[in-house]
Amino acid sequence: MSAGAYEGVLREIIHAFKYEGRRSLADPLGGMLRDASSVVLDRCNCVVPVPLHPWKRMRRGFNQARDLAKRLERPMVDALWRLRATPPQLALNANARHSNVQGAFVVSPFLIRRARLHGGRRPFIEDRTIVLVDDVRTTGATLDECAKMLLAAGAREVRALTVAMAEKSR
């Protein structure tokens, strides 16, 4: 589910937020996402932001998906790690995008280890309804790969929320 189309003013706002470091825009964008997806959020146990590779996060200074997820007023779990930096998806077609992110994500080993240390309890994501959060959905390749990892780790259901959906996805 997306709150709007990735065009016009919304596209400009997301660009300013993501690439110009205008983190104050997380509040209105997160509010827009929260308002548009209240039914989905009411049925979830937690939200999981799509992770950035550590080098990209260092360069940008923040993870835009995490900033958005914080504003959804639901428990947030950093359940995923991005293992490898992937080339930018911008110029890739749908098939290349899926290949580009294949194997790029794993469930956080800390999450699994913490569960084992506490009497073998299941990881927090097991048997839960999870909402993945990202800024823009284009082909869905990144969200699909993240969902695949969460489901393999035992999530009951994974839904995806984005602020905007690019025309290629509609």
What are the roles of these predicted feature ranges?
Residues 1-133, 139-170:
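Conserved PRPP/pyrophosphate-binding segment of the phosphoribosyltransferase/PRPP-pathway fold
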